[in-house]
Structure formats: C-alpha cells, structure tokens
Design a protein with these regions (language model features):
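Catalytic-loop of the protein kinase fold
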Residues: 151-167
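Conserved HxN/HPN-centered segment at the entrance to the catalytic loop
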Residues: 81-99
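Conserved activation segment of eukaryotic-like protein kinases, specifically the C-terminal portion
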Residues: 189-202
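Conserved N-lobe ATP-binding subsite of Hanks-type protein kinase domains
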Residues: 35
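Conserved short submotifs of the Hanks-type protein kinase catalytic core
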Residues: 105-119
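Activation segment signature within eukaryotic-like protein kinase domains
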Residues: 139-140
Length: 320
C-alpha cells in the first residue's frame, strides 16, 4: 500500500458506490462524457486509513462512448504493462453506480492512480502567471519523456493540454485522458481535441498525422508554461495570432506578444507550431534544440522546481 495516498476515512463522506465494492467520496473532475471521483476499495481498509484511487466514470449512453472507453483502456493497459507504470489499475465496462439518493446508473469505469497534486494547469496560472523559462524547461523535459513513451508505441494522444497533465505526490508529471488516443498514421481524419491546442490541418479537414498534431499541442503547452497565457484565443483564421501561424508570419506573431522570450525559445516554438505539419520539428529535434540544451536537468534543480510548485500549491489551496 502506498503511504503517499493513505488518507483517514474520517475526512470523507461517501457520495456513491460502484458495485458495492468501491466507495466514492469526492468529485475531482468532470468532462463532456466522464466524471472523475476519488474513492477507495471497501475490502482494503487499513485500520482508520485507506489508500485512495481515482475513478473515471462514464455513463454508458451510446456505442461511441463505449468505443472510446475500450480504446482508452487498451492504451492504458499497454503503456502500464510495458513501462512498469502504476497509473492504470483496472476497469469494468459493465458496472452499476449507486447514488446516495437511491438512483442507480449503468456505467463503465477506469480505476487509476490518484494523483494528489492535481492539474499542472493550476500551477501555471496562480498565484502568478507563468513559470519562466528555467522552471518550464524542467517540466517540459518531463512532459516530453512521457510523450516519447506514447509515440514509441505508435500512438498519438490527440488531446494534449495543461489540464491533461497531472502531478503525483512528488510533483512528477503524468499525462492522462487517453480517450482520443489513436494508432498513428498519416491519414487520420477524425476531428477531436481542445480548441486552443488545435493544429491548422484539423481546421482544414485534411487527413493528418496524429503525432505531428501532438507536436503542435506541445508547442502551445510550452508557450503557456513559460508565459501563463495562451498564444492565441481560439484556433480560427479570425484570431489575429492564429492567423499569423496560418500564414507563416512568425515575426509578426512574436511582435504582437506582450511577453519577452529568449531567441532560442521562440525558435523552438516556431518549429513546433509550424503551419506545415511535415515541416514541424520532431521529438528528437525538440530534445536536441538549443533551448533544451541550455538546461541543467540535475536532481538538485528538480528539487528547487518541486519546492516552487509546493509553494504555489499552498496558495492554490487557500484560493479554493
């Protein structure tokens, strides 16, 4: 049992149950098709304490939801088995959720590691915007390491964003939400993702390479990490900053930005958000870029980063 995720039961009240096996005690996230709860196994209570997990719960209302669910489970299972990850625990596609009000629902669920430090998104925007180049470089290296695992298995995530990057109890990065992930090819045509992270080829309804799409999203993530702002308001030709990307006018894009970044960082981001997907930099080129080579990825520097994130977490908790 992991001591980091042990909690006193007296802190919580049951709000729902899955199959009379798992008690759910807190809602920690909600998306278009799924709700994420914090919960525990009723058969594994250790005295007054219990180990908590996260449960991604989907109401099974149509075949598309079940297809997406099965796809995510397959990918999580593959990544966990081949990379010795403890993130994925188990799943069920035929379960029942019992609410306290007596209502019950047919559901599918995925039981995953509870990542106690939450979304990276929160740490970027509060208490001050952005993490600066040095801290961002360390975090981005960890994100890239996670993406390498996904891409090495010939998958594309297709919904990379700061809200889908979680932090465990030691502030280590974990990418989550594989509902849109797909086997990579150059002829993907299904439209998905989050608007502020969409590459141009998706807007043009052209067949695209999923991993090149991930690179574009990583470029947006890097910009957000450093500055605490989005590079454009919306992925649309009507957005003046996105329009610069569509026309390849990167100097004009940067001249309109209020933030001042180093030349090497701007060059790297240019390569990642390049309009032409075939000319976008690869993961290997990101790692070997001048900006990434400026970093010192020592244990001591990661300790300093985690100290900064811990300070920010205290202020985030006060705000909430």
């Amino acid at each position: 049992m992991s001591s980091s995720n042990l909690y006193y039961l007296s802190q919580f009240k049951k709000i729902a149950t899955i199959d009379d096996k798992y008690n759910l005690v807190r809602k920690i996230g909600k998306g278009a098709t799924a709700t994420v709860y914090m919960g525990y196994d009723t058969s594994k209570i250790n005295g007054k304490q219990v180990e908590m997990y996260a449960f991604k719960v989907l109401k099974v209302v149509n075949d598309d939801i079940l297809t997406s669910f099965n796809n995510e489970v397959s990918i999580l299972s593959l990544l966990s088995s081949e990379d010795n990850s403890t993130y994925y625990q188990e799943h069920s596609s035929k379960s029942i959720l019992y609410k306290k009000n007596g209502k019950k629902y047919d559901i599918a669920y995925i039981k995953i590691e509870y990542l106690s430090n939450g979304e990276l998104f929160d740490y970027i925007f509060y208490p001050k915007k952005g993490l600066g180049e040095n801290f961002s470089r360390l975090i981005f290296k960890s994100i890239i390491d996670e993406v390498i695992v996904i891409h090495n298995h010939n998958y594309a995530h297709r919904d990379l964003k700061t809200e889908n990057i979680m932090l465990d109890d030691s502030f280590n990065v974990k990418i989550c939400d594989y509902g849109f992930a797909i086997k990579n090819s150059n002829s993907i045509q299904s439209y998905c993702g989050t608007n502020g992270y969409l590459a141009p080829e998706l807007l043009m309804n052209l067949p695209f390479n999923g991993q090149a799409n991930d690179i574009f999203a990583l470029g947006v993530i890097l910009f957000v990490l450093v500055t605490g702002t989005m590079p454009f308001r919306t992925a649309s030709p009507q957005d003046p900053y996105y329009a610069c990307i569509l026309r390849g006018e990167y100097e004009k894009f940067w001249s309109g930005c209020k933030c001042k970044l180093s030349e090497n960082l701007m060059k790297l981001i240019d390569g990642m958000i390049c309009f032409n997907a075939q000319e976008r930099v690869s993961i290997a080129e990101i790692i070997s870029s001048e900006w990434m080579k400026e970093g010192e990825y020592s244990e001591e520097n990661y300790k300093v980063l985690k100290k900064e994130l811990s300070k920010r977490k205290k202020k985030i908790i006060r705000k909430k």
